[in-house]
Amino acid sequence: MKKLLILLLTVQLFLIQSQVKKDLVIPKNPKIGLSLAGGGAKGFAHVGVLKVLDSLGIKVDYIAGTSMGAIVGGLYASGYSGKEIEKIVMDTDFYSLITDPKSRQESSFFNKSVDKYLLSIPLKNGKITLPSSISTGQKNVYLLKELFKNVSNIDDFSKLPIPFMCVATNLESGNMQIFEKGDLVQSIMASSAFPSLMDPVKIGDSIYIDGAMTVNYPSKPLKDKGIDIVIGVDLNQDLSKREDLNNIIAILNQVIDMNIHKDTRRQYKYTDINIKPDLKGMSATSYDDKKKILDNGYIEGLKYTDILEQLPKRDFDRLRQPTNPIYSNVYKIDSLSLEGSKIYGKNYVLGKMGLRLPSLQTYGNVNKMIDKLVATNNYRFINYDIIADKEASYLKLYVTEDDARHFLKFGLHYDDVFKTGLLLNYSAKRLLFKNTNLSLDVVVGDKPRYYLNYFIDNGYIPGFGIYSSGMSFDLKDISNNTVDRWEWLRNEMFIQSVWKDKFAVGGGLSHDYFKAEINDANIRYSRFLNPYVFIKSDTQNDKDFPSKGIYIAAEGKVVDLLKSEVDKRIVQVKADIRINIPLTRQFAYRLNLYGGITIGENLPSFYQYRLGGIFEQNVVNFKRFGGFYFAQLNTNNVILISNDLQFKFNKNYFLSGNFSFANLSDDISFEDAVKLNYSSLGITAGYKSPFGQIKVNFSHSLKNNQKGIFSVILGHWF
């Protein structure tokens, strides 16, 4: 046993020594460089090594990084300690950074009403345009601008607390590009713009991608700077075996890794201390294993303590740059400047951002305001700087507008009411007028239907719109038998004023056409012309699994304006209010208040309030009510209160319980209003998939003999 331990220690010592140059001689007062390789999530190992360097007080004179090495190295060069970078890594949702989802809460009012598509394909000059990557990198800008705000006035990277450079690849020439000056955030984004994951980054007249395509392990650039001792953190792994090369992604990664391996071997001769953490089983996308990867880097770094302790020590503990008076936590913006703007002018930008000038702002506020601008879907990417003149400072936006005007979109959905539907959509921007949006949905499936929406968005100045829809559906009884079959067509003209993309107020005139029949007999036709007013709001953070925000849809209308007797006209008022309250990070309480009243007599049956079923489509005066079949209950006046307790786990999984109760009455009276006629309990299991919601619901009505009902929902509602 004793001999075995000695053998293991000897082998370990040999392996460590093999990572240190045999002829390494540490000169007097050597300059120390740090070479940080690229590798996506594997780059978290850099942070563990930095923690070791910090614990030993090692003085680093220059840092070179590629891709994730550029991000970590840039933070360290800007004065962050290893522990501080560790906290940043652990607190950051890297999947969200890659997928780059637009904030629903900041989306325009029109976009919130059409967020139901799985795929959107731009059309330019009549041709389909494929996306250049999964992400534009917009969320990376927000994060990096916030992290590097303390050095945002430094455009010469040699002036950072630790001199720094990062490597990118010129996409046009294929040549390596070393960034040592310019916009630090933009340079780091260029170095880490992995093809297909992140859009190429435009700097000057060139576009750049991940530096790993040319030099993934930048040790030679440090030697070229006169660095004596280069400490490298090597993330290189063996190429995949034949049995693992069984799909297109694995094959493409292998092709890329071949060149990375070849260049990394060349860089070894410029690396004096080569620290290679154990990353077996890890990949560039192993973000769920970030703690393990970081710890492996720390463990590997500790093995080199003896040689590292021989290096010079720094004279101070903190490298963080003192607070800049202009780029501090709160700073003043006197004016706005745009670069790259061809379609949307300064007034449009200021209005959508909600930016008043002059004003005091924080980086967080600027990020949120730019996010509002991005959420309009009129921009592909927005970068920014705060530039100080002698007497004032201004916010400069570098915008890349989305000049596509026409789109084909697709969706897929299933529910127990409208069954299976394939959604085909044509959308257009700036059609006939500058601030217009057109959306035409055609649903092919068990219940064909269409929706047409055209609106001129003038912000708070009233804009004109038209809306048209058509569908058919079956009404059920307590035994789930069809008791009526309706066809419904609606055409509307309206005006609408939108306030801060959160509230819409307006009014219009709608024409409804109904055809109803049962077993091809007793066919009824009716037409109604109804003037109406409305107020709407939607600040929910998620359409399918909201945990915060509110939803309001209130409407008042006169039913059948052309009815000859004015005093017998019927007025209806209804409101749908949903309040989502986050209780903890996992739990949320959702309250839905729905009410509708009818003033007048002889209400046409088509305008009765009808409850039952699990659905979210806009259908006359129908409202979902778990535990009952679609439109099973009908009345002239209704109060419905629904309570949900939602639990979120494993990021995209949800479990919720529901208790709902309703009052239905044909007359308006206090005595009728306080009675609870119907109630139900329900439970829902849900998953937020890349293709939309997946939900399974079981609901059971109380106080009657009706059986429980299972419901399945797949995909976004339409």
Language model feature labels by segment:
Residues 364, 369, 383-544, 614-623, ...:
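Gram-negative/organellar outer-membrane beta-barrel architecture
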Residues 245, 476-478, 517-521, 566, ...:
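Outer-membrane beta-barrel and related beta-rich outer-membrane complex signature
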Residues 410-412, 531-650:
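C-terminal outer-membrane beta-barrel translocator/porin domains of Gram-negative envelope proteins
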Residues 469-473, 510-514, 555-561, 596-598, ...:
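Short glycine-rich beta-strand segments
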Residues 19-66, 74-371, 375-387, 393, ...:
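Patatin-like phospholipase
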Residues 1-25:
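Bacterial Sec-dependent N-terminal signal peptides
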Residues 646-678:
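C-terminal hydrophobic structural anchor segments
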